[in-house]
Amino acid sequence: MNFLDLPEECIATMISFTSPFDACRISAVSKLLRSAADSNTTWERFLPSDYRMYIDNSLSRFSNKQLFLRFCESPLLIEDGRTSFWMEKRSGKKCWMLSARKLDIVWVDSPEFWIWVSIPDSRFEEVAGLLMVCWFEIRGKISTSLLSKATNYSAYLVFKEQEMGSFGFESLPLEVSFRSTRTEVYNNRRVFLKSGTQESREDGWLEIELGEYYVGFDDEEIEMSVLETREGGWKGGIIVQGIEIRPKELL
């Protein structure tokens, strides 16, 4: 039997075991393959099993492929706008950003040290502006049930300098980590906020990598941390948007 003689549903099921990128390439081969490759059967498999949690009535009329592209092209704000979710278009892997409001930041509600501000280039309503602290501590947690299985993830602190610049970070290294809360072993790295470790992002913000973590098939909680609590030197002048968690292979 010729492959193209198979029922469209069967072809769609086979295509669903490839990747979103491959499905788009297959759809360009012929009209029959395009119909199968663009079908809800194919794209249902590329969507997260819990995707219905992230959509409202305005998205309910979308086809599965349209939903997938919507998740990839425009991050969704959930949990009262404190968390951002999207998917990587080529692989369909899940990506997240926890806003500053979602993080545990020491002294963040003390206006002499931190202030909450709104700026136009943030995806969240509020970001945390650091005035000055001697104890710099930011922590966040996420369940691996929200991440893609069998995937190596990295976490990044997303920030920018205030207009007058930052201070105190030049000579004080930050201790950063990305680890399971089950382990008692702290494999912290030291990085400098103002050095070659920071990277510019397409959205105009900066980021530093906190670490890597392989997400297997067990559900557990993982923690991200950024600390400078040893030296006690005063530091300030940055704006924290949040912590982003995305697959390591995405550059």
Curated annotation (Swiss-Prot):
Disulfide bonds: none annotated. GO terms for molecular function: carbohydrate binding. Residues 1-46 form the F-box domain. SUPFAM superfamilies: F-box domain. This is Putative F-box protein PP2-B12. It comes from Arabidopsis thaliana. The lineage of its organism: Eukaryota, Viridiplantae, Streptophyta, Embryophyta, Tracheophyta.
